[in-house]
Curated annotation (Swiss-Prot):
<dbReference type="Pfam" id="PF01119">
    <property type="entry name" value="DNA_mis_repair"/>
</dbReference>
<dbReference type="GO" id="GO:0030983">
    <property type="term" value="F:mismatched DNA binding"/>
</dbReference>
<protein>
    <recommendedName>
        <fullName>DNA mismatch repair protein MutL</fullName>
    </recommendedName>
</protein>
<dbReference type="InterPro" id="IPR038973">
    <property type="entry name" value="MutL/Mlh/Pms-like"/>
</dbReference>
<dbReference type="InterPro" id="IPR037198">
    <property type="entry name" value="MutL_C_sf"/>
</dbReference>
<dbReference type="InterPro" id="IPR042120">
    <property type="entry name" value="MutL_C_dimsub"/>
</dbReference>
<dbReference type="GO" id="GO:0140664">
    <property type="term" value="F:ATP-dependent DNA damage sensor activity"/>
</dbReference>
<dbReference type="InterPro" id="IPR042121">
    <property type="entry name" value="MutL_C_regsub"/>
</dbReference>
<dbReference type="InterPro" id="IPR036890">
    <property type="entry name" value="HATPase_C_sf"/>
</dbReference>
<dbReference type="InterPro" id="IPR013507">
    <property type="entry name" value="DNA_mismatch_S5_2-like"/>
</dbReference>
<comment type="function">
    <text>This protein is involved in the repair of mismatches in DNA. It is required for dam-dependent methyl-directed DNA mismatch repair. May act as a 'molecular matchmaker', a protein that promotes the formation of a stable complex between two or more DNA-binding proteins in an ATP-dependent manner without itself being part of a final effector complex.</text>
</comment>
<dbReference type="InterPro" id="IPR014790">
    <property type="entry name" value="MutL_C"/>
</dbReference>
<dbReference type="GO" id="GO:0005524">
    <property type="term" value="F:ATP binding"/>
</dbReference>
<dbReference type="GO" id="GO:0016887">
    <property type="term" value="F:ATP hydrolysis activity"/>
</dbReference>
<keyword id="KW-0227">DNA damage</keyword>
<dbReference type="InterPro" id="IPR014721">
    <property type="entry name" value="Ribsml_uS5_D2-typ_fold_subgr"/>
</dbReference>
<keyword id="KW-0234">DNA repair</keyword>
Length: 610
């Protein structure tokens, strides 16, 4: 076969194959064009999820008859100066979208330039039969796409069910709407309105907050930390969820570069690293984060759909994003998810409903540490005992009160007013601390709370020095289930030594331990080594030092913490509460589970119909 030139229509169909995968791709390209046209209102109408009909209407600057003719040709654009290719601020710039869409559909464009006397219309079928006529239309542009992929039936066969395609389109519109809170958006499918977002005209932070409430939900804002981070050539703003408000997938993570929605691996990894101290590995935070960067420091022309970008200095961007998120979470302090109390109240109302707890939608109740009950001796006596109340040796066992609280004194009342977690009143099942504030009761999981405190304490030690070791009077021999786990620990023995653990191989499946970190106190060495082996065996020899430290610190913290089932004095309970108040992110343990739940008095009154 001889070499020959492809026809213009064939070239456009090939280009469409790269850019237009489904109806959502068409909506994305056309809505982005409307945004670039300085629109304040964009309406989207779909039939059969866009397979039969897509209509995009805007009130933007519009086009003249000459501009209409040029707009449907390949590589024509009004959006940037080709001499300034490194300074792209618009969504589109390649000039491929309209001709590519026209090549695989029946397209009708009607447009009227602002302050013009006439509107014009152009009709294309499969990219051909271009004819401009005079029409009637308001200022702006309306684009109708019918019978998508009629010219490429093979692509049509690969489309998913209407529901799936519609979900993808709604997701696209939501992302663009989040980035442009001043623009009004509406989305109608088969006559039913799915989205109606009113444009906001207040200050930037208020506009963004309201648009996030409209798109993601009010619950997210209530359980999110605000990000406001700036450097001379870089700024990050947005919201990211508290660790206890999380999901089982990353679908609710909205990331933007210069208002362009992206699904960039670098940013996703940075987000993961920022939360690694607070979330189990199978849980994901929710976020809407906007990065503004000098266009010359980022290349948006590396992906056909512009979904990925390339940074001039990726490590710099990664580290800044991690720092921005951690700063925001630290400022959120020990606050836990506000939805948890509501879920608990629902459980009270429907105690016999045999279904998954709504709490499990927010937190990871299946994490490895969820049911962990260490048998080690508490090191709680190292906690500062400032501002403690008079001893209240009130213990609740099996949900029945054994002894009423007596001798309420003025100091306790001051404690309730002064401290967010209030004054300890009792202990439930020797596992949960009940405390009282001015307008609520707080239920604290003593093991999860102390595990978080221990985690932060051990991290602080590791930042400045090696952990102090204590030599075991009698070395401990730990037999592991298989040789792989024993080898894994032995392979990391030098790194573990710096983390306070001295061990050697003892036979095929056993490890002999001679020194442990002093901070762990009277720890169960057998359980410690077994848990550590479980953590590390999945990663083998190639685990990075930072990941190794993370796993070891998690394991140490779990064994450092006070056990469920141990009775605490009022002084110990109050000391734990005070230290929680002074520790950032103490509202959740290392796996994203809440360390405490607060029930407001008004919520309790609702339970009793008051």
């Amino acid at each position: 076969m001889t070499i020959k030139f492809l026809s213009e229509s064939t070239i456009n169909r090939i280009a469409a194959g790269e850019v237009i995968e489904r109806p959502a791709s068409v909506v994305k390209e056309l809505v982005e064009n409307a945004v670039d046209a300085s629109s304040t209102k964009i309406d989207i109408i779909l039939e059969r999820a866009g397979k039969n009909l897509i209509i995009i209407s805007d009130d933007g600057i519009g086009m003249t008859d000459k501009e209409l003719e040029i707009a449907v040709e390949r590589h024509t654009t009004s959006k940037f100066d080709e001499s300034d290719f490194l300074n792209i601020n618009t969504f589109g710039f390649r000039g491929e979208a309209l001709p590519s869409i026209a090549a695989i559909s029946k397209m009708l464009i009607t447009s009227k330039k602002r302050d013009a006397d006439k509107a014009f219309q152009i009709k294309l079928i499969g990219g051909n039969e271009k004819q401009v006529t005079i029409s009637v239309h308001n200022e702006g542009t309306k684009i109708e796409i019918r019978d998508l992929f009629f010219a490429t039936p093979a692509r049509l066969k690969f489309l998913r069910a209407d529901k799936t395609e519609l979900t993808a389109t709604v997701d696209v519109v939501k992302k663009i709407a989040l980035a442009h809170p001043k623009i009004s958006f509406s989305l109608t499918h088969d006559g039913k309105n799915l989205l109606k977002l009113k444009g906001q005209n207040k200050d930037a932070e208020t506009n963004l907050k309201q648009r996030i409430i409209d798109v993601i939900g009010d619950d997210f804002i209530k359980n999110a930390a605000y990000i406001d981070f700036k450097t001379p050539d870089f700024s990050i703003c947005g919201y990211t969820s508290s660790p206890t408000y999380n999901r089982a997938s990353s679908e609710d993570q909205f990331l933007f570069i210069n208002n362009r929605p992206v699904k960039d691996k670098l940013l996703q990894v940075a987000l993961r690293v920022a939360y690694q101290d607070y979330l189990a590995r199978d849980r994901y935070p929710i976020c809407a984060i906007f990065l503004q960067i000098d266009p010359q420091l980022v290349d948006v022309n590396v992906h056909p759909a512009k979904a990925e970008v390339r940074f001039h200095d990726p490590n710099y961007v990664r580290n800044l994003l991690i720092e921005a998120i951690k700063n925001a979470l630290t400022n959120k302090s020990h606050v836990t998810s506000t939805t948890i109390a509501s879920d608990v109240l629902e459980l009270f109302k429907n105690p016999l409903v045999n279904k998954q707890s709504p709490v499990s939608k927010v937190i990871n109740v299946n994490s490895k540490s969820a049911d962990y009950r260490p048998t080690t001796h508490s090191t709680l006596n190292t906690v500062p005992q400032n501002h403690v109340c008079q001893k209240l040796i009130d213990t609740l066992s099996h949900a029945k009160i054994e002894q009423e609280v007596e001798n309420r004194i003025e100091h306790e009342q001051q404690t309730r007013k002064q401290y967010k977690l209030g004054a300890a009143k009792a202990q439930l099942h020797t596992t949960y601390i009940i405390s009282q504030t001015e307008d609520s009761i707080v239920i604290t999981d003593q093991h999860a709370a102390h595990e978080r405190l221990g985690y932060e304490k051990i991290k602080d030690y590791l930042k400045t020095e090696e952990l102090i070791k204590q030599r075991l009077l009698i070395p401990e021999i730990v037999e592991l289930p298989n040789e792989k786990k024993a080898d894994c620990l032995y392979d990391h023995r030098e790194k573990l030594y710096k983390l306070g653990l001295t061990l050697e191989k003892f036979g095929e499946k056993s490890i002999i331990v001679t020194e442990i970190p002093n901070i762990l106190g009277d720890v169960n060495v057998q359980k410690l080594i077994q848990d550590l082996a479980d953590h590390l065996s999945d990663f083998g020899k190639n685990i990075a030092l930072t990941e190794l430290i993370e796993h070891v610190t998690e394991t140490y913290a779990c064994h450092y913490s006070i056990r469920a089932g141990r009775k605490l004095s009022a002084d110990e309970m109050n000391a734990l509460l005070r230290q929680m108040e002074n520790t950032p992110l103490s509202g959740q343990c290392n796996h994203g589970r809440p360390t405490y739940i607060e029930l407001k008095l008004k919520d309790i009154e609702r339970l009793f119909g008051r």
